[in-house]
């Protein structure tokens, strides 16, 4: 496995025209530039994951791709059009977003929140319909929250709430779905549940997903396409099996490691190098017996 040449990564673009891309965008907040002349393409029908160290521009790029952040230079293209010039409802019918921090209104039920995903499809001549109700019910069923429809969102666990937000995004019925750190604040079981759900949406429904993840091993296991950012620059992109190497991990995070095959999936698995060799204390002859006794008690 070998990662991309950093000098070629930003300039090398596929000849295929994909639905969502950023072209030479400069991104930042106020006067602080996060990324300069950054280009990235999201392959159609992929599960693309953006990875990199803290403050490298992952969420900033996702915000630009979702029309939440306007580039100071360059442009984001959605279906060949500059996304900033498109009507908000038109974008919302094509692209759904699950932000990093989602806050539900007080006193709202799961069913009501998921129903809000149908808002982009409403208008003066098109009000709530049986089709809308069917889509909401299907979205809740596919995310495993149908039985929670009458529960208040603020009563749910973190994992349940995240599934509800994904259900709302599904109710938009967009071919593109962007998720900013969807596993943040979740325990390991709920992280895997959410990522399994994302994989199902990609594989079974054919949606194009773009997610920001901190865990490189999760990214390598679930993504079909990785974009590796450092300092606002794409330093590698491609299939996890092609680019995730010990050299790439050291360049991204400054961390030495081994990259082995995941015994469950065969995808790359990053094993960090131990900073210090641990000394195993010598055991006396009675130690095994004491250990067994504690385990049995």
Could you describe each region identified by the protein language model?
Residues 20, 34-37:
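Conserved structural motif at the start of ABC-family nucleotide-binding domains
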Residues 177-181:
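Catalytic Walker B motif of ABC-type/P-loop ATPase nucleotide-binding domains
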Residues 115, 130-148:
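Conserved ABC ATPase "signature" region
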Residues 74-82, 91:
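Conserved ABC transporter NBD signature motif
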Residues 127, 152-156, 160:
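Conserved ABC ATPase signature
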Residues 252-297:
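ABC ATPase nucleotide-binding domains
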């Amino acid at each position: 496995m070998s990662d991309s040449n950093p000098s070629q990564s930003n300039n090398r673009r596929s000849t295929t025209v994909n639905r969502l891309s950023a072209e030479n965008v400069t991104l930042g907040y106020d006067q602080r530039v996060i990324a300069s002349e950054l280009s990235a393409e999201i392959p159609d029908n992929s599960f693309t994951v953006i990875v990199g160290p803290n403050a490298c521009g992952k969420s900033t790029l996702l915000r630009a791709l979702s029309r939440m952040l306007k580039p100071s230079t360059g442009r984001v293209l959605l279906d060949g059009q500059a996304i900033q010039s498109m009507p908000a409802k038109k974008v919302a019918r094509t692209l759904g977003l699950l932000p990093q921090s989602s806050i539900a209104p007080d006193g709202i039920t799961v069913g009501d929140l998921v129903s809000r995903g149908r808002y982009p499809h409403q208008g003066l001549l098109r009000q709530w319909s049986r089709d809308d109700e069917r889509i909401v019910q299907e979205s809740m069923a596919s995310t495993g929250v149908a039985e929670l429809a009458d529960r208040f969102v603020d009563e749910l666990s973190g994992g349940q709430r995240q599934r509800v937000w994904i259900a709302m995004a599904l109710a938009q019925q967009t071919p593109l779905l962007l998720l900013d750190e969807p596993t943040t604040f979740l325990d390991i079981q709920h992280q895997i549940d959410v990522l399994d759900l994302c994989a199902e949406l990609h594989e079974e429904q054919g949606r194009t997903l773009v997610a920001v993840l901190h865990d490189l091993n999760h990214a390598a296991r679930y993504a079909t396409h990785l974009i590796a950012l450092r300092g606002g620059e794409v330093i590698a992109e491609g299939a996890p099996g092609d680019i995730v190497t010990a050299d790439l991990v050291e360049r991204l995070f400054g961390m030495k490691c081994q990259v082995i095959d995941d015994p469950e999936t065969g995808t790359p698995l990053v094993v960090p190098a131990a900073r210090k060799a641990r000394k195993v204390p010598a055991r006396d002859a009675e130690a095994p017996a004491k250990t067994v006794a504690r385990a049995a008690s």
